[in-house]
């Protein structure tokens, strides 16, 4: 019985943590843009407008999504070429089909 209670408690705590991370008030859901390009003329959605920030958000600081996307786009390096070379073997099915067509 104690084991069942412990598992139930862990489940409830895990669900509460996930619900807190994905929860938005209903009023903010109505203001959210429907499509990615729907708010082109408007100011970007800021984290500080969402209300009081949770502890993890305060630790991360306030960054606009365009800044985060720009930072990610800068992180292209020599590993991209290495990945292309490493994944070159994945087209073996196409090569096998071409080799089969060459033999009468």
From Swiss-Prot:
The UniProt keywords, alphabetically, are:
Amidation, Cleavage on pair of basic residues, Hormone, Phosphoprotein, Secreted, Signal, Sulfation
Gene Ontology molecular function terms on file:
hormone activity
Sites of the modification Phosphoserine? 96
Where is the protein localized? Secreted
Q: At which residues is Phenylalanine amide found? A: 92
Q: Which residues carry this modification: Sulfotyrosine?
A: 87
The signal peptide stretch is 1-21
Superkingdom assignment = Eukaryota
Where are the residues of the annotated region Disordered? 26-70
Q: Which InterPro entries does its entry note? A: GAST, Gastrin/CCK, Gastrin/cholecystokinin_CS
Q: Name one GO biological process term.
A: response to food
- Short name of any one Pfam family annotated for the protein: Gastrin
Chain residues in the propeptide: 22-58, 96-104
| PANTHER family cross-referenced by the UniProt entry | GASTRIN
Primary role: Gastrin stimulates the stomach mucosa to produce and secrete hydrochloric acid and the pancreas to secrete its digestive enzymes. It also stimulates smooth muscle contraction and increases blood circulation and water secretion in the stomach and intestine.
Record-stated family: Belongs to the gastrin/cholecystokinin family.
This chain belongs to the protein called Gastrin
Record the organism: Ovis aries
Q: Which gene encodes it?
A: GAST
